[in-house]
Amino acid sequence: MTLLIKSIDDLARQKFDVFVPTMGALHAGHQSLIELAKQKGDRVLVSIFVNPLQFENKDDLAKYPQTLDADLKLAEAAGATAVFAPTYKDIYPDEITKIDAGEIGKLYEGASRDGHFSGVLTVVKRLFDLTKPSVAIFGEKDFQQLFLIKQMVKQLNIPIEIVAAPTIREADGLAMSSRNVRLDKDGRKSALIISKALKENSIADMHKVLAEEPGFTLDYLEIIDEDTFLPASEGSKNKRAIIAGWVNGVRLLDNKRMGGAL
């Protein structure tokens, strides 16, 4: 049976090999992270903490689904050893020292969500300090977040291996996200334009596909160099298309590894 840990003192009595940080509202995408974690170590800890620091929009924070009972069942089914569900005071007991996300943290998601990545890095660093795992699992769907966490771990010499897990999709191609439950029937249909666009092989063709769907409002579409997170050039070895926008006021993200010419 999966153990529920609610206090830092109880957490300190335990030792875990692999850590999967989440904000709850777990779905099959999170399940895949936990299952991957089980391949990396015997004792897997999942955290559930909705981090206020990464929400610029307080209304967005208020609407974020919180489903602890269902989350515990999914975590147990996926093989988690324990779930850590701390309070705000556990994570931020004193004055908060925020981590600067740097110049890359101001681009793309960072440009649209002021302070978002500083909030992400701050909570991840705090959770790392508390949980002390050997390995941590993060999904590729939030690719800029993954890049910045890897950068932070390298810069601060944190002795944790960051493992990237592939994006899990619904049967129709939509990238799984806790926010998808906020889409109505028409919005759900409009959202499919994102994965449809990513099937194209050039950014120009992606824009053409996106223009077909009036229900989708584009924020950004870019092909970046995975090693720098700056716009890719012909010499870039590892390229990835990243996209974000809104459907029904719900922000959606996706990305795809690219090959060939720009």
Label every model-predicted segment.
Residues 209-262:
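Phosphate/ribose-recognition catalytic cores of enzymes acting on nucleotide-derived substrates
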Residues 2-215, 224, 228, 256:
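Nucleotidyltransferase catalytic core that binds NTPs
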